[in-house]
Amino acid sequence: MNFIVVIPARFASSRLPGKPLADIAGKPMIQWVYERAKLSDASKVIVATDNQQVFDTVKEFGGEVLMTSPKHESGTDRLQEVAQQLGLAKDEIIVNVQGDEPLIPPAVINQVAANIQGNSWASAATLSEPLVESEMVFDPNAVKVVSDVNGAALYFSRAPIPWYRDEYQQPVSQVAPRTDGLVQRHIGIYAYKVNLLNQFVQWPMSALEAVEKLEQLRILSNGKKIHIAPSCELVPGGVDTQADLDRVRAKLKSS
């Protein structure tokens, strides 16, 4: 299995500015992510950033890093620039690991790479896990996904999908936990074929993408297929807020 991992790392986060450099148990967060990715089967792990502080920090801990344009609208655009800088062939595979996932299991990195290699019809691959608690089902920050019998994603949404017509007529507090496994939360790790990245940056933002603010809908809107499968391991949430950062600090400090 041959693939590389790219970790996009933006410094200017609106909710947690400077989070790639946030200290977690004596190391910057981006170093934790990098070291987790290095435990996968990737042939190369690269941080892609538009910030000199992040660039210098990665160099200091011995990581590989590329400086990319500050004008990218998404991490996917940044990945395409990395593929271009590295001169990757169109059939090569890049796994996008988010720069705010210091607890990412290496096994899921391998899994998503294997899934795109094992399904020739897929231009991208990603993962999901069951959502049980009603509050999370109705939480717009928890992106839901539905798929067909072959594992091809049909749609991603911030809304509750599928919609249980009878059960969802009552208040959320009275909705029973979902135990049938049909409600799946999307996990934000992707494997892409470079050819898909080259096409992605040429496509305009789709209407559905603009409404939901989910860039993967641009792929589906242009007729390409995304393979989706349940993650082989539990994937702890990433770091979006100070509360998330405190949670991760506590976990890694005690480990």
Curated annotation (Swiss-Prot):
The keyword DNA-binding does not apply. Keywords: Cytoplasm, Lipopolysaccharide biosynthesis, Nucleotidyltransferase, Transferase. Gene3D superfamilies: Spore Coat Polysaccharide Biosynthesis Protein SpsA, Chain A (3.90.550.10). InterPro entries: Cytidylyl_trans (IPR003329), KdsB (IPR004528), Nucleotide-diphossugar_trans (IPR029044). One of its GO terms (molecular function) is 3-deoxy-manno-octulosonate cytidylyltransferase activity. GO terms for cellular component: cytosol. It is found in: Cytoplasm. One of its GO terms (biological process) is lipopolysaccharide biosynthetic process. PANTHER family: 3-DEOXY-MANNO-OCTULOSONATE CYTIDYLYLTRANSFERASE, 3-DEOXY-MANNO-OCTULOSONATE CYTIDYLYLTRANSFERASE, MITOCHONDRIAL. Activates KDO (a required 8-carbon sugar) for incorporation into bacterial lipopolysaccharide in Gram-negative bacteria. This is 3-deoxy-manno-octulosonate cytidylyltransferase. It comes from Saccharophagus degradans (strain 2-40 / ATCC 43961 / DSM 17024).
